[in-house]
Regions:
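N-terminal Lys/Arg-rich, disordered targeting/topogenic segments
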Residues: 1-2
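Hydrophobic membrane-insertion alpha-helices, especially the h-region
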Residues: 5-21
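N-terminal, intrinsically disordered, polar/charged segments of Gram-positive cell-envelope systems
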Residues: 22-56
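Cell-envelope and extracellular/periplasmic
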Residues: 23, 65-71, 139, 150, ...
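Soluble non-cytosolic domains of exported or imported proteins
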Residues: 51-55, 72-83, 197
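Acidic/histidine-rich, surface-exposed loop or edge segments in extracytoplasmic proteins
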Residues: 56-73, 180-189
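Solvent-exposed, polar/charged alpha-helical surfaces in well-ordered, non-transmembrane soluble domains
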Residues: 59, 63, 76, 80-83, ...
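Extended substrate/cofactor- or partner-recognition/assembly subdomains adjacent to catalytic sites
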Residues: 91-249
Length: 249
């Protein structure tokens, strides 16, 4: 009988995108009102359609908030997410002003769901759900975050392993407002102990390594106790790359 081996991964300690809004000793993150024109638009690359749509900024944020946070969350949580999403978008618009588009509509930037899609999935709940999302966006209209007078890179995440990551460990860039802190309340998240199970064959395919009967895995950890590198049968890769290859949260 052919034996099938399975590898189960507990998703703890693998770096994810994280944002930490802190108040350093000399400088601080400040929430400001962005005095943009009412017709300010964001150029969104719709990846599956391979098109670029120009969408009013605040309307775009309604689609982002719908895609990035469950509508069942408390209004104040949705409002905080709206500020983070607006900040992230403004930074991308600033960075990509000379490019064809500002931002993409998937998790490479922010998940954006258009109105037609939301109607199809929310069905009879559409009106109440969309009104709650709109309230969160409207009540934070124009609000964004800066550090030392500059719009911050407002990366955000769903669930950490109990600590956020240093920006340098994930993106290779030192940012004083993106440093590791304890985030123990993430332990109550339904995603905290998420796991994925792969057959050995699928696992090798996903990490682009030749199949071997013997599977030897070694890991090193960084200062936050997250996975820094993972070595699979003498092939070393970064923990962040391993996460992306296996599509881990």
């Amino acid at each position: 009988m052919k034996k099938i081996f399975y590898l189960t991964l507990i998703l703890i300690g693998i770096p994810t995108l994280s944002v930490l809004l802190i108040k350093p000793k000399e400088k601080e993150i400040i929430e400001k009102k962005y005095m943009f024109e009412k017709n300010t638009k964001v150029r969104v690359k719709r990846v599956e359609k391979n098109t670029i749509e120009t969408i009013p900024l605040e309307q775009y944020l309604i689609g982002v908030l719908s895609g990035e946070m469950p509508v069942s969350y408390e209004l104040e949580a949705l409002k905080a997410q709206a500020v983070a999403a607006r900040t992230y978008t403004l930074k991308k618009m600033e960075t990509n002003k000379n490019n064809q588009f500002d931002i993409v509509d998937n998790t490479n930037d922010q998940m954006y769901l258009d109105n037609n899609y939301l109607k199809s999935v929310w069905k009879e709940n559409y009106d109440s759900y969309i009104n709650k999302i709109k309230q969160a966006v409207n009540e934070t209209s124009g609000e964004y975050l800066t550090y030392d007078g500059q719009i911050i890179k407002a990366f955000f995440f769903s669930t950490s392993s109990g600590k956020t990551e240093n920006c340098k460990d994930v993106f290779g860039e030192n940012l004083p407002y993106l440093v590791s802190v304890s985030s123990t309340w993430d332990e109550s998240s339904p995603s905290y102990l998420d796991k994925k199970t792969f057959s050995k064959k699928d696992f090798y395919e996903k990490v682009n390594l030749p199949y071997e009967d013997e599977l030897d895995i070694e890991i090193t950890r960084n200062d936050t106790n997250s996975i820094n590198t993972i070595t699979i049968n003498d092939n070393e890769m970064k923990g962040t790359d391993f996460r992306y290859e296996l599509d881990l949260k």
